Amino acid sequence: MDDLYAINAAKSEFREGFNLADPSRMLAIADPDLVNFSDGQPSEFGESGLDALKTRLANLFERFTAKLSVIVIEIRLQGDIAYDYGWHDLTLTPKGGGEAIRRRNRYVDIWRRNQEGNWKLWMYMDNQDIADPFRPEQIPSAGAQVHGSF
């Protein structure tokens, strides 16, 4: 199987596992030594981190119906290591009723080819995407006072 195809297939499997509320399916793509730096969560490493992540996902899926869309910008291959980056668009709808939560995270995945030749997610980092504060329509005129920091 072509390497780019294999990583795209693994990303699709991650998305499907998320949308079907199946933490085991999601984590089947993970390397046993996964390093997880998810936004707003504790750093997690290896098997204990995978166990904690699985529990956290199960708790999330008990409370919400989840819809994840993955936008991959690029996949770069360098031997037995690869990385991809892009956005995860997430909608969480409370099962008990209420307004849906929408969030867009930017992410970086680092993949490692294992001894069997399969690509596994080795390192994951994400954080919430924000609007560009330097869009021309938001830049004050030369005489305007600016408050805040850059």
Summary of predicted features, one role per range:
Residues R104-R135:
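Short beta-strand edge/turn micro-motifs at domain boundaries
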Residues L90-P94, W111:
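Beta-strand elements of well-folded, non-transmembrane domains
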Residues W87-H88, M125:
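A mature extracytoplasmic/lumenal domain signature
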Residues K120, A131-F150:
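Terminal "cap-and-tail" regions of soluble proteins that handle hydrophobic small molecules
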Residues D2-N8, S12, L20-Q78, W87, ...:
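A solvent-exposed, acidic/Ser-Thr-rich amphipathic alpha-helical stretch
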